[in-house]
UniProtKB/Swiss-Prot annotation:
UniProt KW keywords: Cell cycle, Cell division, Centromere, Chromosome, Chromosome partition, Kinetochore, Microtubule, Mitosis, Nucleus
Recorded GO CC terms: inner kinetochore; kinetochore; microtubule; Mis6-Sim4 complex; nucleus
Annotated localization: Nucleus; Chromosome, Centromere, Kinetochore
Gene (name only): fta2
Gene Ontology BP terms: attachment of mitotic spindle microtubules to kinetochore; cell division; mitotic sister chromatid segregation
Listed Polar residues bias regions: 54-66
Designated name of the protein: Inner kinetochore subunit fta2
Positions of the UniProt region annotated as Disordered: 1-71
Stored InterPro entries: Sim4_Fta2
Length: 351
């Protein structure tokens, strides 16, 4: 009885376990059957790594293409604007240049006419035709005047002799001799050719004193190449002014410094020295493109004593000498500033 009951219980347990396994298999089959192809076994969405990059690549290429096209169009528009602005600027420059050239030509013609003192009288240029002896050509003459003063910018120039000769019916060769009012030793000669119809300048040559050639010839040569007689005469006048001022300054410094040191000079430099050092002041006459003077001056020194202690002391004394020189000149002018600095450097107890 008890054995039969035990076998029944075992059969029931076996049947229940088999039922559980069957139900689990059915459940698993249902889960697999209802799972989408785009999901994993755990039910998570599957990511297709092959399709998406291709789509993004196509989109990025198209967007990059649009950006490049827009950038090119923008650059082309900017280039077109720059070309247009450049053309407008070039046109404006040409208009202004033509106006300036016309004004300069008019001024130069009037200047030459005034310079040569051309009046209403005429000089006969002999072009008689053998077939018609009465045929002659006439042209304006330039009557010489002594000590002719020009406009205020070059008023110091004096013309002492004026000779002319007709080279053709339209060209007159003029020879002008003159000097500078405050430097009579600066005597010059100008040879010019002028077209009588419009007083246009065709040719210039010049002669100046030997002492002026070193500093004046370079600018004068460039001026005659440009046929700029105004700048040439202005340079003559201003050179004479600065040359005279420089000479007077050297004599002024020499008068005061010879009491305390040895002083010497040449055209461009002034030298002062004692047993310890030698000071040199340089004054050069230089010109800009219009013939105005831009003087260049500086100071330098040379140590003479070889004693280390003295060299050390003098080096400290002369340190930043250029800077001190510039300060003195800006405060007191070139002449007085140079004198005050030299007096400070050459006190009696130093040399």
């Amino acid at each position: 009885m008890s054995g039969r009951r035990y076998s029944q219980i075992s059969q029931q347990e076996g049947s229940s376990s088999s039922d559980d396994s069957d139900s689990q298999q059915k459940k698993t089959k249902r889960t697999v059957a209802h799972r989408s192809p785009n999901t994993t076994l755990n039910g998570m969405p599957r990511v297709d790594s092959r399709a998406r990059p291709n789509e993004n690549s196509g989109q990025s290429k198209s967007s990059n293409g649009r950006v490049d096209t827009d950038r090119k169009m923008d650059l082309l528009r900017k280039r077109s604007n720059l070309v247009h602005q450049t053309l407008l600027l070039e046109k404006e420059v040409r208009v202004r240049r033509n106006a300036i050239n016309q004004r300069d030509d008019s001024f130069l013609s009037g200047f030459i006419k005034s310079l040569l003192e051309i009046d209403s009288s005429v000089v006969i240029y002999n072009t008689e035709n053998p077939d018609n002896p009465k045929t002659k050509q006439v042209m304006p003459s330039a009557e010489p005047k002594k000590h002719v003063k020009l406009n205020s910018s070059i008023s110091s120039i004096r013309f002492t002799q004026h000779e002319f000769e007709a080279e053709s019916e339209k060209i007159i060769h003029h020879s002008l001799k003159g000097d500078i009012e405050y430097l009579p030793s600066f005597k010059f000669l100008l040879e010019i050719k002028v077209r009588t119809i419009d007083y246009a300048l065709l040719f210039i040559t010049y002669k100046i004193p030997h002492f002026a050639r070193k500093e004046l010839s370079s600018f004068s040569d460039s001026a005659i190449q440009c046929l700029d007689i105004v700048a040439l005469l202005r340079a003559f006048s201003l050179f004479a002014h600065h040359y005279s001022y420089r000479c007077n300054t050297w004599f002024y410094l020499s008068k005061h410094m010879k009491k305390v040191a040895s002083a010497n000079m040449d055209a461009q430099c002034f030298y002062v020295q004692n047993s310890f050092y030698k000071i040199t002041i340089l004054y050069e006459i230089k010109f800009d493109d219009l013939g105005f003077v831009q003087p260049n001056y500086c100071i330098s020194y040379i140590l003479k004593n070889q004693n280390e202690k003295i060299v050390s002391i003098t080096s400290k004394l002369l340190n930043q000498l250029d800077k001190r020189f510039s300060e003195f000149v800006s405060l007191f002018g070139f002449r007085e500033g140079s004198l005050l600095l030299l007096q400070a450097l050459f006190k009696p107890h130093l040399g």
